[in-house]
């Protein structure tokens, strides 16, 4: 008998070599699978994630699932057991027993990524692993206007880093919000979409920064999208500022459907 568990987790990614299991490297998937192996006295339980965050990238709302053998453990006990075995840079925040047709990756309706960018002139030693850094002049209003050109369904080849294995580069961006956190002297970017290509959020942030810094024309992203050429945006924002914030398994709420008003 197998019981499928859906679990939401947060992790500080700066000491992990990404989410996905890699030989002889510290990864999020490997850490969780090691704990499950101890719980089952040596059985390999494969953990499926909603996506593969890169080295140094963080998560507030990563979702995983796995099939646990033997007697069903109540969800409240499973989360206690796993959290007791996690290092201090991982915590599980929710646990549910779900039907076997639920899949952490293939049941997704959308994802929400957040990017935090420090505007401090010098790199803050307490932020260096948790924000990007851009100590230059930025026009936020221009960035907000330019971001509207990314909304909707497009081929995002120009915003996909080489090395990605997915051939279909068409994605839908539902929502983009760019705000200033005056207290922290940071800009916060929020992106909600049907899915995101390899490094896509970080490349979009880099392009918007070029517009905000007046190194790229206001509506140049329309041309960039049409070009379908990665060389059109050569910069990629630092991974330290990126957070997988939330994964949607129900329809995207209407308040996040800016694409419907284009």
UniProtKB/Swiss-Prot annotation:
Pfam families: PseudoU_synth_1. Gene3D superfamilies: Pseudouridine synthase I, catalytic domain, C-terminal subdomain, Pseudouridine synthase I, catalytic domain, N-terminal subdomain. Substrate binds at residue 113. Its EC number is 5.4.99.12. It comes from the Bacteria. It comes from Lactobacillus acidophilus (strain ATCC 700396 / NCK56 / N2 / NCFM). The gene is truA. This is tRNA pseudouridine synthase A. GO terms for biological process: tRNA pseudouridine synthesis. Formation of pseudouridine at positions 38, 39 and 40 in the anticodon stem and loop of transfer RNAs. Keywords: Isomerase, tRNA processing. Homodimer. One of its GO terms (molecular function) is RNA binding. Belongs to the tRNA pseudouridine synthase TruA family. InterPro entries: PsdUridine_synth_cat_dom_sf (IPR020103), PsdUridine_synth_TruA (IPR001406), PsdUridine_synth_TruA_a/b_dom (IPR020097), PsdUridine_synth_TruA_C (IPR020095), TruA/RsuA/RluB/E/F_N (IPR020094). It catalyses: uridine(38/39/40) in tRNA = pseudouridine(38/39/40) in tRNA. Transmembrane segments: none annotated. The active site is at residue 54. HAMAP family: TruA.
